[in-house]
């Protein structure tokens, strides 16, 4: 008998796929389309187990849908721009382009060795000119519409990587890659007006029926829509006003001070004549702009000489510069109510600012101790003049009416989300296609001159982008007036590239950004990736899709119909990482066990949404199962050569039992496939093989039927072995182009059933009965059974409870 030689089987199968262009996809309006997409990887150089799991999930789905008869698009590409390539290039003394392309070539070979069904004819790399040309074109369209703009902005500045970091890229006050303490810095930045789409992004979350609730909740919170009042505080002895937004106008009469951001114009003005304030503002520049960090860091403030007038009581109120107020949020000012806000309470305790209670609890028994903490619940107004006794709802309306009438405030809808800063001060990215002219200002590059090419022959150092030092790149003529001008040296945030790549896969060689093929394939039917992308990539991609729709490039409102967020791969309970020394190299596993074993283990060890705990024993178990599959084929290959067909009238009792088990497991497998519960699909495969092995006298036709069903269920998981056996057993040419098995409902109709017999609730017997018996007949047969009679003779049968074809309970006394 031949041994399972996974190496030969996998190489020959992959060669077959290559020769036959098996995975190439073209548009076909006669078939239902299915677009299956896994998030494109960063080409780091080698695959890790997280990659293997993620892309196996996508491949299983793509292959299953193909066997369902659908026209499946399953592309792959590379998120190739970004700082890691730049840093690696400096370290290895290579250009980022060379380093990236070398990594792509190796990782593509690793993907192929795993048998992934990617259509490589659609491959894209975001660093290729043919790709980024179109995002430059798109940016220019957005600029013309006023959706892209440039302004000075306080940013998170990484002094080591010499670039701006998004709030999400700051971890514990440090840059996510360099680990350097992040500083605040004001520089010109390019932005996209995501706030113009905030309402639609929020409302359309209701359309995402097949997204995880956790992701939707994170996006809802990130967009952060809230209704409140904007209140005007007049600056004393000045015509100026400070506006603040609040969702709690019921606490307005308890305002003890205003907090303004260190970068607020009033703070900067006073700092010119106050060296201590100037020093405090400099100190604040070294603190994070992350909201999460602001919540936990020490609250610091500096009392200014500025006073404001309360809009209702006309009391004079102090203004403090506070390190927890951000200039980029609202007006850069907040009203502070220490008695009813915990952050304000902590600040007031530190600086001995008095508290004024203006809310009491609805619960008279609740004792409020403002010496211990703020009372933050809604309740009844006190110490609030004409508003005393009102609850929150009535106070909101009364105060809104008063402020609006006096022109001292108005109702506002606010969003937590802010415009997306897309500038990065690094080299290895897509050049922003703008030119700065002293006379004309910022001017877009002429579309016929696109792409603005990123120079590849550059000397990289750790001191920021070299683009500003390349005369032939930076010195250009103004597209409008022709005078000498300077090219923009910022590059796009890499999330810009990954926000639309899914659409470019539909027409990767098109001489426009997108063509009609995009509307054939979009939206993506199944998108697979980590939940860590919930509020950056997934939100930006939704935003981009709406921008492309409004540009007439796509017709759908949302990019991804169904989102699957896979769990992490763990070892010893921790995420695999080099720093922890718990990395498992997929290539070593492929060499030792074969790609099919690695794929099968990664799908069987846990359901996709759960974390997968690495287990060498589990890998060995997966390999053992595949050897059993191979051996069954070897032992029965003579049968398959006979070209036998199933004849139901010739089936034995054993055949019928086996077919019931096989088709029951097939039915469960189809249900679980559609729910993406792949671990239980694999379990069904194992049960089918056990059925085939456990019956000694199965008809040859049932063996052929059962094993062909097994191979087709297993094929999306272990495509090499199943392809090989399908051909070896003369079942067909290519299992991928074979229809997925369907359940024979006749096989699920049993001639007999196993009945559990209980007496007074205790198991006494199991009887195999004819399925055609009525309830009365079942009762008669059971009561006449000799074994059962031994328990009920000389006893009174009080009642008989029958659960059809499952259980009968005889109550006696």
UniProtKB/Swiss-Prot annotation:
Primary location class: cytoplasm
Entry GO terms, CC: cytosol
Compartments, as annotated in UniProt: Cytoplasm
Disulfide bridge partners, by residue number: none
Motif 'HIGH' region location, chain numbering: 41-51
Keyword Aminoacyl-tRNA synthetase: yes
Molecular function terms, GO-annotated: aminoacyl-tRNA deacylase activity; ATP binding; leucine-tRNA ligase activity
Keywords: Aminoacyl-tRNA synthetase, ATP-binding, Cytoplasm, Ligase, Nucleotide-binding, Protein biosynthesis
A Pfam match: tRNA-synt_1_2
EC number: 6.1.1.4
Chemical reaction(s) catalysed: tRNA(Leu) + L-leucine + ATP = L-leucyl-tRNA(Leu) + AMP + diphosphate
PROSITE patterns listed in its UniProt record: AA_TRNA_LIGASE_I
Short motif 'KMSKS' region, span: 575-579
GO biological process: leucyl-tRNA aminoacylation
Binding site for ATP: 578
Similarity field: Belongs to the class-I aminoacyl-tRNA synthetase family.
Name of the molecule in the record: Leucine--tRNA ligase
